[in-house]
Amino acid sequence: DGDALLKPCKLGDMQKLSSA
């Protein structure tokens, strides 16, 4: 499941952007 791997990555990126 590519989406399963992409979802956490996208969430992580969003959190990084929010933190920054």
Curated annotation (Swiss-Prot):
Instruction: Identify one Gene Ontology CC term for this UniProt entry.
Output: extracellular region
**Location in or out of the cell:** Secreted
Highest taxon in the source lineage:
Eukaryota
Cite the entry's keywords alphabetically: Secreted
General function of this protein: Prevents juvenile hormone from being hydrolyzed by general esterases by combining with it specifically.
Please report the name of this protein according to its UniProt entry: Juvenile hormone-binding protein
Gene that codes for this? JHBP
